[in-house]
Design a protein with these regions (language model features):
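Glycine-rich active-site loops that engage anionic ligands at enzyme catalytic sites
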Residues: 18-137
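N-terminal intrinsically disordered, low-complexity, charge/repeat-rich segments that act as generic
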Residues: 1-22
Length: 137
């Protein structure tokens, strides 16, 4: 299984490590969908994060390596259920939640290069709106 992912978000490029040992099913499901193209918007309930709302999209995974408190640079996948399916990236303090209350998502991907641009991406998304994002090998 490939362990590194290139992420282009807005004008920034990041390198990220798949957490294959901690979230093998989530990583495999995500890899099968690469290249993955979407847009990020700023979170509404969770703090300093951006997210990809995915509605009823199914990755076919349950919970593994799940958390409500991702650290900056960590991506989590919420597989759906109480709220819609989503991918969230923390750029600052996050307490993952929706209007239904606290949620937990699978930490499956961690930025390892480009962290110095993470806060700028978050603030750009907050003040300028949706940004394109592409995940690829």
């Amino acid at each position: 299984m490939e362990n590194k992912i290139k992420i282009t978000a807005g004008p920034y490029v990041f390198a990220a490590r798949l957490e294959t040992e901690l979230a093998p099913q989530t990583c495999a499901a995500f890899l099968a969908r690469l290249p993955f193209k979407s847009q990020i918007v700023h979170v509404r309930w969770s703090g300093e994060g951006v997210w990809i709302p995915l509605g009823d999209y199914e990755f076919g995974v349950g919970y593994e390596n799940h958390t409500s408190y991702p650290s900056p640079g960590q991506f989590i996948l919420y597989p759906g259920g109480i709220s819609e399916t989503e991918i969230l990236l923390a750029y600052g303090g996050v307490h993952f939640a929706s209007k239904m209350g606290q949620l937990a998502g699978n930490h499956f991907l961690t930025i390892v290069d480009g962290l110095e641009n993470l806060m700028a991406l978050g603030k750009m998304t907050l003040w300028k709106g949706a940004q394109d994002i592409v995940f690829e090998l």
